[in-house]
Each structure stands twice: as structure tokens, then as C-alpha cells.
């Protein structure tokens, strides 16, 4: 088989030798840097058809179609209606003109009466129609020579969304037609999938074609939103950005609540979330883009079948979310019918099965409501401090950040939360270096291995994932963390794997990749050929696409053939071209004399003679004349003359063909081995998915432990509830205490936050002035409770948090014009959901209840809500400015009155933002209005009106509590690093310890720890002064000091040539001491003969240069 590669695709053709008219065989090379990688001189490269069946499909495609009828079926008509609806949203003038030329009598929308519109059997349009009939709701792109073309409806979509111009302009007598060059395929696919369209790509079978016969074509792959086109990736050296997978989503309703099914075609898996509230369902829809949305008929409430099911009563929020999307209705059994729809959408066989990734759990908290998620910044919301940004350092993004977000939106079960918390605790205290935690998308990994398109880069990344897991298994401090991560990974993937089995399978997979993939850059066989007579650039371009991919032992025969053919080519060039060049050099002539050289024609992938004026005017039988007579014009792949200055000989052409054949055979063997490796790893795909997710979780939790340590957050005591009905609640299960709570968006280490202590054993009724901090307190409590039940650190000095079954926060409401609801209606809808779901294990936080309606009736509604929540036994806070609620005859028995404090400063009342006992009837409304710039005249008039009507109630009543004395945990001792054996840099480590020991009060306490080439420092270094020694790849040392060791290591490794640097470090007490030790090490190590890269830094200070030290020079180490 032969093959051809482009930047975006690799297409194949069978070895039809009898079609070659010449004995010369031609080939191409794979050059990622070239915009068009189609070989123009030599016939193409290596087949990537899966097997003989693929060729069979190509050659028999037309036979199947001849039996089909030209009459449209009902199903075809439904597809055309679907496309008509999409075309109605087009707005570009050029697209609208193309739409006018469509005729909806076939799936392509072609008008046969227009120019190039014929659908005659056997022509290109007819062939494209057959492919379109297999995937009628996908945009069809067909490879035609140097372009990918679309016609009819698909051309209109390309012009509208991909920014392409119609072929032939806007001629009214021609069918709509558009396309893109092959080097722009990836960009075109991205534009289409970004707008929600799926694309079917049809490739040509490349190679020579018999006269009067058309090229074979086949469907090479699909591009869907969240699932890119990967065909041909195995043969290129660049990585592919893989977006988050987008599932097909189905929504239904039953007596248990709403049900949401998400089916991931790439992973062949689905998740089923049942018993959801409307708010939780909308939250999931907001955070998960879907490829297709299907709505079950059970959502319709009335018999008329109208789709506006939320016009009255429940469902308005969901309707507002769904009405802005494209959706379809379906009936029947929800799961089986939805799976059937998915198989139709993706063209899957009925035998394909999907795995349920749900892990059953009896005590998992309910997912967050949309209002709760937005008001604490779990979902990015304008004007709301983002919770995710303070949980992780800025350097941690992507997959780990998405995991933390999903963890907050769907809090884990109690036992999983405990595992996560215990993991974070261990992570915050480890002293050994940690791996880099290579993060790979599971969907990307599965698709590339399944399609056998994983390239060298991806295999190296997979091996890094496996090696990171094995690194954790080898270290005593990290192996316990690895064991703890097994359950959270099980919940995230739905895969339950035994720990020992997992480790053994990781060993096997890592060894399998290591046996095949070339990881040693110094292997001599991986160097491209070099010959004196041929430009090095030629060999580099021809061989760099396969050299260094697999170990030489697997391709010894192919490498030998390449080297022999390269030597033969060099010999042919020397024999045919060198005498001519020698003759030219021996000629002494003024300006305008003969010129000649051996040159590399990059575009034609050939080595030819390039010269002019070298032919003698008189043939005298001198040296070089015979070679000149052998020269003939060089021809390109189409047989056309390249230029007047390019020449070759039959001997050189034969040598070139043989070299290209040997090089392409080597490349074919390399890709064959890579595909075989993909097949082997497919048998361990579950282990690879599990390992990739485990590392994502590891990186997320390690990063959180580092950031929480920097912010001086704490791990709360998490108290569970008894699951037995009628059992007494566990000790502390009905009480939440947060000591020294600070708003999560403030950095505690900066000292600007106001701390509050919240000891909650019942429902609080909270009052306070405007700007007094009520909303901030509710957000802070909500965030702390959510972080606690998720197993994460909280912004407090100490905390004891029950494992709530739900956390519900309601703050300000806005109107919803989509479903015709006022802001008060929206608020009441949310209050209904909260009241109906609140239990004795819930945390309910309502800010300024009933603010959007008439005061008297709003006060009564608020009082009734408070009674209902009190009856449920939940913990929580209801804040209000409706002071009339204190005059109502409420039956609530467990209400505690709380207020946000205020104090008088120079005759003005100002808030303290402190939580106190009692009731505060002062609103500070006038003061707030003044502060916000309301005209003085307006405020004065307001004060006069107030005094005239409410003078008798003007005095504020504030009941203040005794001062609460809280204790902070400032006496915690930082654990001293535990020494660990290191096998690398022993001599250097001993020298560092010996030098620094002279300055230490307790020399025996010195520990010099190491960080490997692909490792990072542990979280215990966060906030500590460190002295470090970097061992560069050039064997020189760089000595420095820093208070941010991880950041400094990343900065060093970001520089060219320093990616593989390893480090030794020790933690000291204070930056001044670190500076002294830095200077001391620079001078002392230099005297001991070590080569330093920053020797000049030893002269910056006047200390550390002498070996005689006074007592005052002695410092202590952490």
C-alpha cells in the first residue's frame, strides 16, 4: 500500500502497480511545517485504511446506490425540514443569494437545471449524494484535488459560518458551491463545530488513476462539537487541541422529579441524574454544552401538546433555558430511545454498547441550585467573586479546574468527602518531591487509541501519565495518597479497579510503550542520513517525519535500506554532477560566466543540478562534457518542465526513486508499529482512563492544598448524619460552628478581612443596616459549608461542619421576560423549591426575603416561610429589612435573632460587619444614598417625609451581645521536613549540607531535599524561604534563594535548554538567612571546583565569603 499525508489528513490508495507507466516509482514525505504537504513529484505515501474492507466499501459504494430510488422518503423530508430551519437563521447577503438557488428535491438541495447541477449516475454530485444520504444532518466536505468542496445546502453553511466565499462568485446560473484548501481544513472544521454543526469528511484514494475512470472516495471521519477530526494524526508531529466532550442530552420528568441523561459517544458511556429539581437541572445545562438536546414528551403538562410547558407554574426556568437552544421531542422509554437516537446521529451499529458511569450513593448531597452556584461564584457571574479562582493557584487551569468546579456543583457523598479531605491533609504535609501530574483528556485518549491515530507525541504523554502514577507508588509518602485517590477516581469515572491490579496494569502499559517508543535522543540510528554530496536539508525533510519515533531495533532492516539508498544517491550525484561542477570551477571568466551547483528542490523533494551557461560552445572531449551530455530537464510530478536552470540524469532519478521508496517504506513501518501499539493499549483503555482522571484529581487537590496553605485556610471537622431512620443525630451533626470565618474572596494573609464567628444550632433571623455585610456573611457561610462537605479547605480559623444533604442560597432575583415572570414571581418560584426540599439536614440561606412586593403581605409571606423552615429543623439564615415580622404572632420555637453590628463614630452610624445577637432596626438608608451620590436635595426631602410619617419609630433598636472572644490556631508548628533517601546528586547534597552546617545552630537538623527533572516541590515549601541549587543540563550549577520555590522552578524550566533541570533545596528561617546561605554556597562551591552559572552573584554581598564565621553569623533552619 502507498500513502499520502497532508497537514490535516492522511489518505491512502492501493498498490496498483500496473497503472504506472514508468519503472520509476514516486513518493512523498511528511513535513508538518509545510502548508501543503501533498507531494507533487513523487507519488504518495502510506496507507491508513483499516483493512481490506475499507477498499471494498470504496469500490462498491456506487453499486449500492444504483438500487436506491430518487423519490424522497418521509425521513428524507424531515431532514430537509431540519436544514430549512437552520438556513432561516442565515444572515449574510452572499448566503441568502445562494439559498435562493436551492431546490429541496434531494438531500443536497441541488437544482439539476442549473449549471453543474446534474445528478447523473457516476458523476461527482451523484457520489456526494450517496455519502450525504448516510449522514443527512452533517455538512459534507469532499476532497477534490487540492480542495475540500461542498455543494448545495452544505455550501451555504460553509459561506455563512466558515467565512468562505462561493466558488465562481455569485453566478445565478450555477449551483451553490464552496470549499477550502487542504491546509485550511482544520480551521474550517473548527468554525463549523463551534456553531454546532457536525461534519462528514470524504477523502480521495490518492495515486494514479486509469484513464476514463474516477477516483475512489471514502468517509475518512467526522468532526462533531467536542469531538474533532483525528484522521491522519498518527503521521504528524503536532498535537491536536481537544475540546471538552459535548454529550447528547435528554431530559424527562417523573414523580421523582426531573431526569437528565448525558450520553458521551466518544467514551461510549452515559450518566443518568434522576430526581433533580428544576434549578439543579438548569445548573447542569448551564455548565455542560450539549451536541444535541432531546426533550421527552413527559415535560408537556397539557393535553394540547404545546411546547410552552412552563407558561404557567413550574417549569418556567427550564423552558427559558431550553427555548434558546435547538431541541427535538421524543417519546417512549427515555434511556433506550435516547441511545437509539445517539446511534443514528453518529452512525453507530446497533451492537455498540454504552457504559453507565453512575456510582450509586445513598447519602450524596443534592446538586447546587442555579442561584446558589451563581451567587458564590461556582459558576462565573459578573459582579460575584469567583470561588474557583481562590481555590487554585493561577497556574492551575484546564482539567483540574473543571474537576473542582464539578465537585462543588455536585458535592460528593460523605465517605468520598472524607477521602478527599484526608488526601488534601496528607498532600499539605509531604516533604518529598511530587510528579508534574500530566493531565490528558480521557475523551482524547479514548478516541485516538480507538481510531488508531495516536502519534509519537501522544504516546509519550500517555507514558508520562503512567510514570507519574508509578512515581507516586514508589514513594512511601505518596503511596498512601495514591490509595486514597482510588475512590474519588472511581466516582469520577464509574470504573472500579483494584489497587494492585491498577498498579500492575500501569507497569505493563508503561513498559509496553517504552519498549516501542524511542525515548533516548542520543540513539545513533535516529539521526538522519548525512552524505557529503547531498544537501543535509534534503535528508532532514525526507526522514524527520519517522526518525526518532520508535526504537531502532524494530526497524533495523528499513533503516539499513534507507542508509544504503542514501549512499547510492550520493554516489550517483557525485558521478553525474561533480565533474560538471569541477569544470565550471576551473573556468575563469568575467561576469556572466558559467554557474552550477547541486541544489535541493524542496517543493519537488528532489536533489538536482542547478546551473546556467555551462554548456560548451565547442565540444572538445574535455573533462565533464560526457556528464553534460547526460543532463536532461527536470520534470515535476505532472511531467512539466520545472525551469530552465534545473537538470537531472537517469542515474540520479533512479537513485532518487529508490531512496524515496526506502524512506517511505521506513515511514510505513513506523506508522504500522504505532497503530499496532494503539491496538495493544486498547485492551487497557479502562486503566488508562482511570490513570488520566486520577492525575487530574491529584493535580487539582495538590494545587488546592498549596493555595489553601498560602491563604492560611484550615481543614474543617466534617460530621456525618446517621442513615438509620429514627436514630439520634450524631454528636455535632445538628450544629455548625465557624470560628474566625472570613469572606472567601479576601486573602487572610493580607490581614484585610473581617472575621466572624458563627455558631449555628437553629435558624437565624438576621437584620442589619444596608452595607452592613448581611449578603457577604451569607455568601461566606454558604461557600465555607460547600467547601467543607466537598472535602476542601475553608477560609476560617477552625470549623465544624455537618455533612448537609443540600445547601441552598437565595439572594436577589431578576425578572424573566422569556417566560413572562416578574422578579417577585421568580423569587417565589425559588422559595417554593427551597421550602419543599428543606430537611433537618439542610442549610438554607435567604437574603432579604420578599423584597419585591407590597410590604405588609410580603412580611406575612416571610413570616410563614420562616415558620416552615423552622418546622423542617434545618439550619440557616433568613435576612430581612421587613421589621414588621417581629410583630407577627409566629409559632416558630427555634428562631435565634442575629444582627450585623453598627457603631457611632463622630456622630455617624457606621457598620462593623460583625455578627452580633439581637435585632437591628436601623437601615442606614439615607447614609447609603449619600455615599452613592444621590443629590442632597432628594435625601433632605426623604428625611423630612420620614420624620413626618415615621417619627415615632425613628429610634433604632439594637441589642448587642457580649464580646465574643475567639481563639486562633496561631501556635501550630510547621512540621520539619522528614529526611528521605535520594540516590541522585549525593556528592553535591553532602557538600551543601557541610557548607550550610557551619552556619546552623543545629547542623544535624539540615535536610537537603531533591526535585527530579519532571517533579515539583511539595506544598510544605509554600510561604517558606528556600535556598536552592539548580543542576542544569550542561552540568553547571545555578544557586539562588526564593520565597516561592515552585514559581522559581517553573520560571527556570520555561527557559530554552533548562526544561530537564533538577534541583536541590533546603528551607531556612527568613529571607535574610536565605541570602546569606546563597552567597556562602556560591563562593564555597566554586572553591571546591564546581562549575557555576551565576558566579558573579557571589560578589553582590559582603557576607558568606569567609570560612571563619562568628557566633552572630549562625542562623537556624526550619
UniProtKB/Swiss-Prot annotation:
SUPFAM superfamilies: DNA repair protein MutS, domain I, GIY-YIG endonuclease, P-loop containing nucleoside triphosphate hydrolases. Pfam families: GIY-YIG, MutS_I, MutS_V. It is found in: Mitochondrion; Plastid, Chloroplast. One of its GO terms (cellular component) is mitochondrion. GO terms for biological process: mismatch repair; mitochondrial DNA metabolic process; mitochondrial genome maintenance; response to heat. ATP binds at residues 768-775. InterPro entries: DNA_mismatch_repair_MutS-lik_N, DNA_mismatch_repair_MutS_C, DNA_mismatch_repair_MutS_N, GIY-YIG_endonuc, GIY-YIG_endonuc_sf, MtDNA_mismatch_repair_MutS, P-loop_NTPase. Signal peptide: none annotated. Keywords: ATP-binding, Chloroplast, DNA damage, DNA repair, DNA-binding, Mitochondrion, Nucleotide-binding, Plastid, Transit peptide. The keyword DNA repair applies. The keyword Cell membrane does not apply. GO terms for molecular function: ATP binding; DNA binding; mismatched DNA binding. Disruption phenotype: Variegated plants and appearance of specific new restriction fragments in the mitochondrial genome. Belongs to the DNA mismatch repair MutS family. DNA mismatch repair protein specifically involved in maintenance of mitochondrial genome configuration by controlling specific rearranged portion. Functions by suppressing asymmetric recombination at some repeat pairs. This is DNA mismatch repair protein MSH1, mitochondrial. It comes from Arabidopsis thaliana. The lineage of its organism: Eukaryota, Viridiplantae, Streptophyta, Embryophyta, Tracheophyta.
